[in-house]
């Protein structure tokens, strides 16, 4: 049973997903399913990025390769998927975090415009 809904904002996540090998896509779908169905999502699947005002990273690992998908909670029951990337350094690149924050701000701008009409 779903405890929350996961949706993608625009096509950033879909483009990222389609570029990945099938095994990585399968792992991403398993993590999305965990986010949708588990009341408490393990931190090895979903981790809050400190200092980002609400941005999370979903963590995918296959062998020695690591990927991240940024997302955030619009409310307790709605998770918005943003962009993804293959992680090649120990720390998450600042440019990727900034892109995620930009997309999150864009989401809220669009949502607020819809609510005004």
Listing of model-derived features with the role each one plays in the protein:
Residues 81-82:
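Conserved catalytic cores of phosphodiester-cleaving nucleases, focusing on short active-site segments
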């Amino acid at each position: 049973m779903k405890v929350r809904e996961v949706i993608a904002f625009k096509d950033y996540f879909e483009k990222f997903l389609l570029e990945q090998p099938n095994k990585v896509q399968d792992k991403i779908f398993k993590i999305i399913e965990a986010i949708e169905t588990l009341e408490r999502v393990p931190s090895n699947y979903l981790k809050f990025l400190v200092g980002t005002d609400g941005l999370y990273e979903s963590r995918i690992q296959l062998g020695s390769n690591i990927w991240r998908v940024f997302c955030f909670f619009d409310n307790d029951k709605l998770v918005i998927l943003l962009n993804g990337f293959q992680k090649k350094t120990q720390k998450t690149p600042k440019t990727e975090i900034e892109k995620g924050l930009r997309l999150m701000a864009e989401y809220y701008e669009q949502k607020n415009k819809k609510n005004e009409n």
